[in-house]
């Protein structure tokens, strides 16, 4: 029945987004996580993006560390930047930046993801209507030379100063840099 529904959508000319297959491997609670400066939910996920799939526009309200173990995945930022990662490479999708995953290859792209987020926050928030959004800005540099004008998520900015203030006033966590005491 599911295959018939997909065939009907394809025939009608409607774009069918993403046969992206997530599998939650483990979920745990960390009572005092440095990345969230308090209690955090930690989730391990296995994600398969099949050839030709284009994910929906979304963001993650927390930290996400990703490792590609097979195939190639392209991450398209809502502001137009793209990065491509192949098996053996790792990347982050953090700070609430809008993005989507694309598999332009001929084999499955397989990733393992670790989500670290404030307790009670979801893994992912979908952008309503699957509309491309740019933002939020992560650095003051992104606000300069007219860069402020491209951002429309979570809101627009009237000028460079307003964009820079948004970046500078975002909550931050300070972490000690881990050291190997024997080296």
Roles of regions detected by a PLM:
Residues 60-79, 89:
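Glycine- and acidic-residue-biased ligand/ion/polar-headgroup-sensing regions
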Residues 122, 132-183:
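Soluble extracellular-acting proteins and domains
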Residues 1-12:
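Bacterial N-terminal signal peptides
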Residues 49, 78-96:
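Short acidic-glycine-tyrosine-enriched beta hairpin
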Residues 95-122:
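Ligand-binding loop in jelly-roll beta-barrel domains
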Residues 19-56, 114:
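A short glycine-rich, His/Asp/Glu-containing loop-to-beta-strand
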Residues 54-56, 74, 91-102:
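Histidine-centered metal-chelating micro-motifs
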Residues 46-47, 51-53, 72, 77, ...:
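Sec/Tat-exported extracytoplasmic proteins
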